[in-house]
C-alpha cells in the first residue's frame, strides 16, 4: 500500500460503511435571495465545482471491490464495475496500464485498485481511473501463473505424451543462459565430473528483466540454426524470487520451448521453484547441476557398463564356442566320419542291388504286358469280319455300299460287289430266288 488514502467497498463490519472525509474546500456562492433566480448557479458550474472538489479530494485512492461487467473494446482500454454488497463504481483502465497488468482481469475477481476519482461532467457521473491493480488473497504474479497454466494445460502443452526422450549419449549440448550467472558455472562444474568428450555450446542470453524473453527465444533460434544441430537444448538460470524467474513463465517462451525440434531440458532456479518452462520442457531438471546429471552420461558408469558388456560378450562367446565344439565332436563320432570309404562301398553295393532289382522288375512287367496284349489281339481277331471271310464267308453290297441281307434288297440288273477274303467280285443280278415261304418272286 502507498501513503495515499484507502478505503474498502466491502462492509467494514460496523453498522455504517467506512467513510473517507475529503478536505474542506471553500466553494464560491452568490448571496442568496429567497425569491430571485439570480441566486441559482448553472449545472455546468455546479458540476465543475463538484469535479474540482472530488478530483482534488481523492488523489491516488485504493479501492477494494469485485470486478463485474468487464468490457474489452478494440482500443485496448478496459471498462468495468467495482462493487461491494451495497455500492458500486465504474472503473476504467487505460491501454497503457492494461498492457502492463501481469494477470488477466476477469469478472468475479476480488481486487485492490489504486487510481484517481474522475468526474465525467457531460453525464454528471464519476469513475475510478485505475493506475494499479492487484488481486486480493493471491499475488498478481501467482494469479497470472495460475491463469496461463490453466490455459496451456487445456491446449495439451503439458501432456506426458508430448515428452521426448533424451539421447543416451549426446554429441553436442547447447545451453541458453547468462554467461556470467551461477547456472553455467554449476553446469560446467558438474559436466567436467561426468563426461569430457561431449561438446557443450554456451549461447549467451539475458535471463531476467526487460528483453529477457526475447533474448532467450533468440538463443533457442540460434541453437536450431547450428550445424550440426545440438542433440539437447537446455534453458537455464539460477534461483531467485518469483519476479526474478518470471521470464520463464512468459507465454511466448513457453510456446517456443513447446515448438522446439530439439529435445529440451528446463533447469530453472532451485528445487522448490516450478516455472511453466519446467512443465512444458521434455525434461525438468531441479537445478543446473541436476541438468548435467540428466543430460550427460557419467564417465565412470559408462566405463563400468562397458566392462560389464565386454564380460558378458566374452562369456556368451565362450559358451557358443563350447557348444559348437560339442556339436563337431558329435558329428566326428558318426560312422560316416570314422570309415568313410567303407560307407561309400556299402552305398555302392546298395545302388547296384537296387539297379538289378529295377531291371528285373521292368522285364517282368514288360513280359506281362506283352502276354496280355497277345490275348487281347487274339480275341479281337476272332471277332474281326476278316476272320469270318477267311472261313469262306463273303459280304455283298450294292453300289451304294448297302449290305445285301435279303433277296428283296436287290432287283434284276443291279450291280453288286461281293467281298471275299482275297478280293472283291463284281456281278450283275439277272434274277433272284427266294426260299419257300417268302413273298418275293423273280
From Swiss-Prot:
UniProt-listed InterPro entries: Exonuc_VII_L, Exonuc_VII_lsu_C, OB-fold_nuc-bd_dom
Any single biological process term in GO: DNA catabolic process
Class of enzymatic activity (EC top level): hydrolase
Keyword Nucleotide-binding attached: no
One Pfam family this sequence matches: tRNA_anti_2
Keyword terms, alphabetized: Cytoplasm, Exonuclease, Hydrolase, Nuclease
Primary localisation category: cytoplasm
GO MF term set: exodeoxyribonuclease VII activity; nucleic acid binding
Domain of life of the organism encoding this protein: Bacteria
Region of interest (Disordered), residue spans: 1-38
Entry's EC annotation: 3.1.11.6
Subcellular location: Cytoplasm
Known catalytic reactions: Exonucleolytic cleavage in either 5'- to 3'- or 3'- to 5'-direction to yield nucleoside 5'-phosphates
Cellular component, GO, one term: cytoplasm
Biased composition (Basic residues): 22-33
Subunit annotation: Heterooligomer composed of large and small subunits.
Family: Belongs to the XseA family.
Function: Bidirectionally degrades single-stranded DNA into large acid-insoluble oligonucleotides, which are then degraded further into small acid-soluble oligonucleotides.
Name of the protein in question: Exodeoxyribonuclease 7 large subunit
The organism of origin for this protein: Rhodopirellula baltica (strain DSM 10527 / NCIMB 13988 / SH1)
